[in-house]
Amino acid sequence: MKSAKVKTNMQQFYKNVVSVPAHWKESCVGTECSLHQLSPYIGKLKSSIARDLVATYSKPGDLIVDPFSGSGTVALEALLQGRRAFTSDISAYAKILCEAKLKSPPSLECALEKAENTLSQSNKLPDPDLRKVPAWVRQFFHPRTLKDAIKFATVCKRDENNFLFACFLGILHHQRPGFLSYPSSHLVPYLRKKKYPRDQFPELYQYRELRSRLLSKIRRAYARCPKIPTNGNSVHKHCSVRSLNLPESFDCLITSPPYMNALDYNRDNRLRLWFINPNYSVTTEDKVIQKQEAFKITIASLVKKVNSSLKTNGYCVIIVGERIASKPKTHLSHFVCNIVADYAPSLKLLEVMEDHIPDIRRSRRDYRGTKKEHFLIFHKV
C-alpha cells in the first residue's frame, strides 16, 4: 500500500474516533446470562458490549454473522435479543463453546438428567492407561480424577454433547476446590506449586470427585438463564474464514478477529484442547494470529464476502485489538480500514470507538501487548 494512502486514511481514521460508552467499563459478571460463563476463553468480548452492539446495529429477526466467534458471546446475545446467529471459528474449543451455549438443554432439570446419564455411561468404561497420557497432562491431576475425566470426555465426544463437555472443560483446572485439577490458574493452565506446596497443602492434592463438581457447575450455568429460542435460529461452522461460505444475505456482522501476535490461543487452552483431541499438538497454530500478511489476506477474504452478502443499510462491526508499542502505520485498525476500502467499496466507515483495556481485564497482568481496542463501525450504502 502506498504511504500517502495510509497517511490519508489514518487522518480520516482519527477524525472518527470517539470513546466507548462509560458503562462498557463496568463489570457484568454478576448480571450477564450465566451461560456466558460455561468455560473461560482468553480475549473474549464482554457480554455487555456484545449486547449493546447487537441492540444498536440490528433489529429483532435479523441474521447476525460472527466469523471469528470464539466463545460465542455475540451469538448468544443475538439469540437472547430475538435475532438469529451464523457463526464460525477454526478452533475446536470455540466450536464446543458456541454449540453448548446456542443449543443448551431447555431447562436445568433436563441438563442434570443428561449429566447423570452421561456419568453413568462413563463409569461403565474401562479405566484408561495413564502411561499413554502425556506427562504434562498427568501432572495436573490425581490419577483417579484423571481417569474419571478422560472417561467422561470420551462419552461427551461420542454422544456429541457439547453442553456437558463445555461444563466439564469449565471445571478442568483452577485452585479452588470445585475444580478437578491440582491448584492451578483458571484461564491459562499453570500449576501453582510455589503458592500451594504439596507438603503444606496435602488436601489440595487428593482425589477430586467429578460428579458433584459437574452438577454444581451445571446449576451455576442456569443461575441466570432465560429461555433461549434455539430451533433453527443458529448455525455454527468449524472452519477457517477463508474457506467459509457466508449466508447469501445477512443483516449485520459483529466480530473480533484474533489478537495477532498478542495471544497464543492454542498454548493458553492446551489442557482443554488435549481433552478435546488427545492427538492435539501444542505447536499447531492458526497462522492468522502469527503473521501480519496472513492476517491481512484473511481480512481481505472476509470483507469481499461481506461486500457481496451484507444487506444494504446493514452494519459491519470489526473489533480490533491494538498494540500501543506498535508504530502508527502498523496499527491493525488502519490495515483493516484500508483493506475494506480496497475490497469492499460499499462499506463506509461510520465511526470508530476506542476502548483502553485496564490491567484488571487482562489474562496476564504483566503483559504489555494489547492495550486498547478499536470498534470499527462500517455501514453498507
Predicted region positions:
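A short glycine-rich, Lys/Arg-flanked "PGG" loop and its adjoining helix->strand segment in the class I
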Residues: 296-312
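Short glycine-centered segments of the SAM/dcSAM-binding site in methyltransferase folds
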Residues: 63, 314-317
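Conserved phosphoryl-transfer catalytic core
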Residues: 92-160, 277-286
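Mobile active-site "lid"/loop adjacent to the S-adenosyl-L-methionine
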Residues: 259-301, 324
